[in-house]
Amino acid sequence: VTNKPNVFTSLATRLAPRRRFLKAAGSAAAAALTAPAVLTGRAAGPILIGAGEHTYEVTHDWARLPEGRAFGYTHGVIVDGQGRVFIHNQSEDAVSIFDPEGRFVRSWGPEFKGGAHGMQYSREGGDEFLYLSDIGRKQVIKTTLDGEIVWTIGCPMASGVYDDPGKFVPTNTAVAPNGDVYVADGYGQSWVHQFNARAEYIRTWGGKGSEAGRLDCPHGIWIDTRSDAPRVVVADRSNRRLQYFSLDGRHEGFVTDDLRHPCHFDQRGEELLIPDLHGRVTILDRDNRLIVHLGDYEGVEKLKGYPNLPREERPAGRFISPHDACWDAAGNIYVVEWIRDGRVTKLRRAG
């Protein structure tokens, strides 16, 4: 951790039980999920994936754009307080908005064309905001839901870890309960930067590597509130793991099982949702044990042309390259994929 010194007490004692549950997923849970992931009652019927309470009906290409418009790569997705679905995509307008039935509402953000990556939703008091990670402009932009800019963060040169501001390429953000903002430099130098709610720099940690506390493409970041104290969890993608930190950047543990190329997160109650770039979406329980893999397309990343497979080569009920995913209030899941023409899939809860 660079910059401000921090007090961190009795870490080993306080976190011993948590390290145990972070170490590995339960083998019994994993074994129970070896049954086929795609269930079809009849050829013309609905496509169901998952198991038990986590069974979902699949609708690919759920979001319907006006004629003549296209998404480009679909990189981020959130659901707002009205149940509207916001897609962060690399088209003319960076943000496209849909009602709960998949009907197009409006779009905005031509000034962010081509740079759309992560998108984080935050309710702050009575207001709602978006945090957009722009890999083209190498900025994080806080906006209202209508696209009004609140503030912008560029390369944090105060961190002392950059000799060139162009090496900062933010991929995702997380917002803590106190309003602090955590920025993952996933496509840059693999740092995590912490700012306060006014976008003022606080500290930095991480940096490229595989040892504890180091990261290699920290692609996604989240504030995990499922335990007694909120913690930062990072999708340490190229290291194929999740890595946990305290809110002031102290390493706390890993999750290494049941992951291929984790991209980002969403949380609903005691469950954690993880879109995995290599062909599936994963749900973990409170102890980070596997509940289910959804739409698993094992080996898809080895196919010629991945991820831009022609539509006729995209099996129904299988994912190609999930880049982000989120729940709505009813427990339905929306998945966006890293595909040149974009793909938005709705998983309607059926279990």
PLM regions with names:
Residues 321-351:
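Blade-level signature of beta-propeller repeat domains, shared across WD40, Kelch, NHL, RCC1
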Residues 41-59:
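Blade/loop signatures of beta-propeller domains
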Residues 1-17:
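N-terminal secretory signal peptides
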Residues 68-82, 112-126, 158-180, 210-231, ...:
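Beta-rich, blade/repeat-based domains predominating
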Residues 98-127, 135:
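Blade-loop segments of beta-propeller domains
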Residues 84-86, 129-131, 181-182, 231-233, ...:
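Conserved beta-propeller blade signature
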Residues 60-68, 109-112, 151-164, 202-213, ...:
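Surface-exposed loop and turn segments in beta-propeller and other repeat-based domains
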Residues 17-32:
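N-terminal export leaders
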